[in-house]
């Protein structure tokens, strides 16, 4: 990537070998910049036309003159030229940005449930980016609460389809419902962007094979699980606090039917075994991504297994916060006689990492995901091809970088 200078502007020249993630961010920034530039060009053009008109009015022409004066002719021509130039500039920029006429397009969004900590941050950023940066009208961006009920969410999607929304962005209650939902959207001719909860690989391949306008935007949950395991390996004892040659752990899952929960559960432990560490699973139980449920699970586990528990893995930070409450109530201290890891990098969890109350978490970058999902929706509206999967990387969060992540969240 090179920076060139042309007139008063700096121009980034993106080379062919520039990483895709960087290209996407440049395109995203470019869209916003272009639209702002269009406004300036339009305003400047209209101002020039007005100035010329005023000059002509002061040139001595009379109301009784049948034919326009030369000054008036020049004014009219200049005004028309300026208006046409502004119009062409606006159209060109809008097409380049892929955001032509989005203000009148309707985006239907369904979130699996509103009281999920992480998805609250995600939907707030998604709504902000669609309306403030991409130019959708606020009333045309409708976000509904799936209430953790797939039947309820499917009904919402049917309503979006009936009302002829232009594109849907869906955080499914159950990722296994993706084939059914995809077919509903396909039959209605409405493109769909799935977020956060990934359909299985076979479904994503079907989109490619059948040329279906569907995509998944999100992180690879295997990466988040691996990072959790690595955070335990990076501790002084590599998780084996009592020195018995193995890591004894409790696993608090989100929803066992959810792909993210499955991968985080599997790959957090796999990171340990791949490193040659022996493990012992004391308990694995469903916490439904819920803080209160996780607190009860951790409390029961601590009562049953006591000091034998060396690590508590949680599929998300909300459950890690609940587990911490149980740990502290039991008189245990994180990073001294027990380790605790989560996923999402909720503000409170990151602060706990800084304070030594949580061993680590994994930043589920809702900023980048929300922008990538919205950009994909705009491309679909514009008739562009969109990859079946748009990946966004997780970021490991430990005491070494937790303050940096917290500053970003604020």
Question: Where are these predicted regions, by residue range?
Answer:
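Hinge/cleft segment of the Venus flytrap/periplasmic-binding protein
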Residues: 84, 88-89, 94-105, 114, ...
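Short, Lys/Arg-enriched N-terminal segments with co-localized hydrophobic residues
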Residues: 2-34
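Hydrophobic alpha-helical segments within soluble ligand-binding/sensing domains
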Residues: 97, 101-102, 107, 153, ...
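Flexible loop/hinge segments that line or gate small-molecule binding clefts
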Residues: 181-223, 244-245, 346-354, 359
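Hydrophobic alpha-helical
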Residues: 126, 158, 162, 167-187, ...
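Extracytoplasmic "Venus flytrap"
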Residues: 106-133, 141-159, 163-165, 171-176, ...
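Short, solvent-exposed amphipathic alpha-helices that sit
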Residues: 118-133, 224-228, 259-278, 297, ...
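Bacterial lipoprotein signal-peptidase II cleavage site
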Residues: 40, 54-66
């Amino acid at each position: 990537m090179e920076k060139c200078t042309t007139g008063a502007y700096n121009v980034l020249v993106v080379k062919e070998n520039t990483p895709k993630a960087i290209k996407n961010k440049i395109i995203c920034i470019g869209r916003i910049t272009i639209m702002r530039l269009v406004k300036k060009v339009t305003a400047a053009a209209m101002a020039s036309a007005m100035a010329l008109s005023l000059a002509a009015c002061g040139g001595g022409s009379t109301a009784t003159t049948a034919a326009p004066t030369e000054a008036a002719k020049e004014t009219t021509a200049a005004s028309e030229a300026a208006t046409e130039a502004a119009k062409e500039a606006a159209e060109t920029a809008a097409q380049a940005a892929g955001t032509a006429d989005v203000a009148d397009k309707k985006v239907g969004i369904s979130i699996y449930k509103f009281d999920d900590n992480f998805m609250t941050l995600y939907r707030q950023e998604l709504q902000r980016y669609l309306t403030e940066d991409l130019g959708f009208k606020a009333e045309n961006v409708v976000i509904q609460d799936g209430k953790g009920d797939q039947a309820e969410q499917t009904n919402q999607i049917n309503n979006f389809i009936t009302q002829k929304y232009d594109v849907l962005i869906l955080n499914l209650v159950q990722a296994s419902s993706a084939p059914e939902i995809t077919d509903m959207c396909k039959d209605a001719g409405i493109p769909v962007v799935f977020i956060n909860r990934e359909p299985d690989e076979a479904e994503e391949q079907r989109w490619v094979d059948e040329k279906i306008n569907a995509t998944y935007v999100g992180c690879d949950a295997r990466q988040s699980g691996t990072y959790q395991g690595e955070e335990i390996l990076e501790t002084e004892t590599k998780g084996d606090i009592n020195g018995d040659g193995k890591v004894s752990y409790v696993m608090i899952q989100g929803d066992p039917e959810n792909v993210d929960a499955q991968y985080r559960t599997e790959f957090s432990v796999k990171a340990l075994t791949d490193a040659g560490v022996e493990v012992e699973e004391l308990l694995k139980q469903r916490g439904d991504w819920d803080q209160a449920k996780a607190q009860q699970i951790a409390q029961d586990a601590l009562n049953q297994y006591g000091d034998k528990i060396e690590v508590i893995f949680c599929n998300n930070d909300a459950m890690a916060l609940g587990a911490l409450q149980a740990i502290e109530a039991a008189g245990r201290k994180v990073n001294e006689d027990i380790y605790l890891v989560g996923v999402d990098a909720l503000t409170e969890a990151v602060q706990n990492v800084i304070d030594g109350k949580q061993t680590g978490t994994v930043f589920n970058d809702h900023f980048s995901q929300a922008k990538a999902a919205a950009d994909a929706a705009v491309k679909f509206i514009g008739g562009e091809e969109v990859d079946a999967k748009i990946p966004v990387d997780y970021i490991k969060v430990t005491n070494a970088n937790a303050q940096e992540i917290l500053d970003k969240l604020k």
